Amino acid sequence: MAPDPIALARDLIRCPSVTPADAGALDRVQSVLEGLGFTCHRLPFQEPGTERVDNLYARLGDKGPNFCFAGHTDVVPAGDAAAWTVDPFGGEIIDGRLYGRGAADMKGGVAAFIAAVGSFLERNGPPAGSISLLITGDEEGPAVNGTRKVLDWMAAAGERIDACLVGEPTNPRALGDMIKVGRRGSLTATLTALGAQGHTAYPHLADNPLPRLAEALHLLASSPLDMGTPHFQPSTLALTSIDVGNPASNVIPARGTARFNIRFNDLHTPESLEAHIRDVLEEVGGAWELALQTSGVAFLTPPGALSDIVAAAVEAHTGRTPELSTSGGTSDARFIKDHCPVVEFGLVGASMHKVDENVAVADLLELTAIYRTVLERWFAGAEPRT
């Protein structure tokens, strides 16, 4: 019998799996998948200086092509539990809505796909190939011991995936609004202007770095990086902090540090953005320290067979024609795109990470039906491969 997506989602929400804790969530997933005939591999990883994270790769079938669903069972903290009107980890249903941390992002999506697989098998029997799931416990955290590591393990084990659907909550307002076919890149910069400390009464004996820092930030923030591309919005630069560490009003500081984040489209690379930043610093002059961290580069899965199948399934069940979008933040699709075509579709994300996170029960059931139709249409056109 196919699993009930509502019951499974409630079970998963009741596991307080705040990154890096698993709290039994993957045990529940594994138990249900093994009941459907999947072979499951638990894959814990731990980079030095990080927390140990558990992951799961499950596969049904030993032939290609291999259709993979990717997702995560870790969640962000509930925050102030007193601000919630329900237990954040209670999985309560009130007025047709399922409440709890992870309901939207993305335990609901995980439950819907597992239930969809069960329904697919009941209606169609074994697939003409394989179905797999890659479920991590490190999507909401540093993302160093999760999907990326599982993909490395899969490559070493000869596990090939031919298409991947990531179940992130992609819809802004209503189920069927949007499919993600790519993501912008993300680069965070820590910029420090260097000077010489001194007394404010004798500024000529000091070197105040703050005017230079202010000028550089103005130049960086006021000049558009681009005007966008056919598939991407314009790149953006957002200033996130300025720190001088100087509580005294009569002291010129020796340094000032700012942090900013750039969300960039496919016109840029981390290297080209670094060159742009350094050009601005050279224009302003003075001494600087610059540290950059890239959490993902821009990528696009060109519209094709996979996005067509998902879009057709969405329209068949919701009556909506989904927008193919690259908006929003990063996701683990940024790791998967190097292995196979990947698109993202899941629940409505309006309440994700918020107090009283919730989804419509009707949406969970409809998402399950959409996922089943995706599997049916994908395997209908699949050529079996040994």
Curated annotation (Swiss-Prot):
Which InterPro entries does this one have?
ArgE/DapE_CS, Bact_exopeptidase_dim_dom, DapE_proteobac, Peptidase_M20, Peptidase_M20_dimer, Peptidase_M20A
**Cofactor(s) needed:** Zn(2+); Co(2+)
> What reaction(s) does this enzyme catalyze?
N-succinyl-(2S,6S)-2,6-diaminopimelate + H2O = (2S,6S)-2,6-diaminopimelate + succinate
Tell me which UniProt keywords the record has, alphabetically: Amino-acid biosynthesis, Cobalt, Diaminopimelate biosynthesis, Hydrolase, Lysine biosynthesis, Metal-binding, Zinc
Q: Where does Zn(2+) 1 bind?
A: 72, 105, 168
The yes or no answer to whether the keyword Chaperone is present is no
What GO annotations for molecular function exist for this entry? acetylornithine deacetylase activity; cobalt ion binding; succinyl-diaminopimelate desuccinylase activity; zinc ion binding
Its GO biological process annotations read: diaminopimelate biosynthetic process; L-arginine biosynthetic process; lysine biosynthetic process via diaminopimelate
Q: What positions does UniProt annotate as the active site of this protein? A: 74, 139 (proton acceptor)
Query: Any note on cofactor binding?
Result: Binds 2 Zn(2+) or Co(2+) ions per subunit.
Q: Does the keyword Hydrolase apply?
A: yes
Annotated residues for binding of Zn(2+) 2: 105, 140, 353
Q: Pathway, per UniProt?
A: Amino-acid biosynthesis; L-lysine biosynthesis via DAP pathway; LL-2,6-diaminopimelate from (S)-tetrahydrodipicolinate (succinylase route): step 3/3
The main enzyme category here is hydrolase
The entry sums up its family as follows: Belongs to the peptidase M20A family. DapE subfamily.
Its job:
Catalyzes the hydrolysis of N-succinyl-L,L-diaminopimelic acid (SDAP), forming succinate and LL-2,6-diaminopimelate (DAP), an intermediate involved in the bacterial biosynthesis of lysine and meso-diaminopimelic acid, an essential component of bacterial cell walls.
Per UniProt, subunit arrangement is: Homodimer.
Q: What is this protein called?
A: Succinyl-diaminopimelate desuccinylase
Please give the organism: Rhodospirillum centenum (strain ATCC 51521 / SW)
